[in-house]
């Protein structure tokens, strides 16, 4: 979590109100709708600091070799999500930057299709482009950007299944394509960074990157919740959510619940976080350099 006085970045939370994090995780597991265990961890972080009517929590934490307790104010669900928001990198207004003269970087959370041409003017001479999908994309880049600049021809990148409402239990398949014949497509490697914050449209974008001639993912298990959202109303004004369509790779393998395929595993370490390093990005840079 980020600094939250008197807690500091890098402190290890051991318990909240006398309950261990594992115990909190076990308590909420049967009540929350989560696609996989990565999603449960996300919910545990939020729930641990929002699930009381009291004004404060008693938190036990470890800092270095010492342990201590502190009282901290209760958070709402909305601002508790600050704990899992990924750091924002300093990039240009176009949402991109050059890591070096051979590797470009795009932050999907700051990307805009309107800037697509300018982004490619900046990055077109690189040998690899890293697209960071560890925060939610600010624009839908799949057709207007990835398809336009990165596909040499029409590529079937995903399978969607939709229920046939007149025939319960039956589903129809859609196999959309991105791109068109384009001799000037970007020929370098395209690397998508993913982790436990990668969800829904971000996962669909990662799947699309993997369909490109030199596309791959670097990171760790995603939330496995791509597809649209359909509400199911419940008594008492409550509701729950499902996806009313299936999302599969072109070979028919699943993406929902399990998350997207990870081509190269990489995740942060406590030591790396404390040192201010982005070890997932570092891994992607090493892979990009090895592909040149």
Language-model region placement:
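Flexible, low-complexity junctional segments that flank or bridge functional domains
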Residues: 1-137, 152, 156-158, 231-233, ...
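Stable alpha-helical elements in mature extracytoplasmic
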Residues: 45, 115-119, 142, 146, ...
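Gly/Ser/Thr-rich loop/hinge elements
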Residues: 81-82, 137-193, 197, 227-233, ...
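Anionic group-transfer/hydrolysis microenvironments
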Residues: 109, 134, 197, 221, ...
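Short, solvent-exposed amphipathic alpha-helical segments in soluble enzyme
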Residues: 121-124, 147-149, 206-212, 233-234
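Short, well-ordered alpha-helix to beta-strand connector turns
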Residues: 126-127, 187-188, 262
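Extended C-terminal subregions enriched in glycine
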Residues: 189-211, 216-223
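Active-site rim recognition segments
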Residues: 248-272, 277
């Amino acid at each position: 979590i980020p600094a939250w006085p008197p807690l500091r970045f890098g402190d290890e939370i051991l318990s909240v109100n006398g309950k261990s994090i594992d115990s909190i995780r076990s308590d909420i597991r049967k009540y929350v709708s989560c696609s996989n265990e990565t999603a449960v961890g996300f919910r545990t972080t939020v729930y641990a600091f929002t699930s009381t009517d009291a004004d404060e929590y008693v938190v036990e934490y470890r800092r270095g070799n010492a342990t201590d307790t502190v009282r901290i104010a209760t958070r709402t669900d909305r601002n508790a999500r600050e704990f899992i928001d990924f750091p924002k990198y300093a990039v240009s207004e176009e949402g991109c930057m050059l890591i070096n003269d051979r590797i470009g970087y795009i932050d999907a959370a700051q990307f805009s299709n309107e800037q697509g041409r300018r982004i490619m003017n900046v990055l077109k001479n690189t040998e690899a482009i890293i697209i960071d999908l560890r925060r939610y994309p600010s624009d839908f880049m799949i057709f207007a950007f990835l398809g336009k600049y990165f596909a040499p021809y029409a590529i079937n990148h995903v399978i969607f299944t939709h229920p046939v409402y007149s025939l319960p239990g039956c589903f129809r398949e859609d196999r959309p394509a991105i791109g068109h014949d384009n001799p000037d497509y970007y020929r370098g490697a395209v690397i998508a960074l993913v982790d436990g914050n990668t969800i829904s449209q971000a996962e669909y974008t990662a799947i699309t990157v993997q369909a490109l001639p030199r596309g791959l993912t670097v990171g760790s298990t995603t939330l496995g919740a791509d597809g649209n959202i359909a509400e199911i109303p419940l008594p008492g004004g409550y509701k729950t959510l499902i996806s009313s369509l299936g999302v599969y790779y072109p070979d028919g393998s699943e993406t929902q619940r399990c998350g997207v395929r990870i081509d190269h595993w990489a995740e942060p370490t406590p030591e790396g976080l404390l040192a201010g390093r982005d070890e997932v990005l570092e891994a992607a840079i090493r892979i990009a350099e090895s592909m040149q």
